[in-house]
Amino acid sequence: MGSSLHGGRWNPKGVAVVYAAASASLATLEILVQYSALPRDFVLTEIHIPSGVLIQSMNERDLPPGWQAFPQRSITQELGHNWVSQGHSAVLTVPSSILPSEQIYLLNPSHHAFEKIRFLPSTPFRFDPRLK
């Protein structure tokens, strides 16, 4: 899992977390800020989270100043690591650092309810070449 190999905004290296965006448009923005050239080999995967799976939420007002900084600061990685370690939920929503009014879904693969989350078949995704 890529996020555990390198770490991310919400997890330090060695802590597995699956990142998902609430919409395809947000996923596109999140990918575009990571790459200097348009990626060619991406797919979109819809995720179904059953109603019985607890989803915790962290709002922008819950976060410390500078949480959006790039590169990411260790404080957000600590928050994510604590969430994984405590194991209260399989899913945590957090604001996107690009568009804080939109949500990123963090999935904890080590949580017992993770197996209830369904990943639907992926579809190829082509970035519009006008996005540069």
Where does each model-flagged region fall?
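Active-site and NAD+-binding cores of ADP-ribose-processing enzymes
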Residues: 12, 38-132
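Long, hydrophobic N-terminal alpha-helical segment
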Residues: 1-41
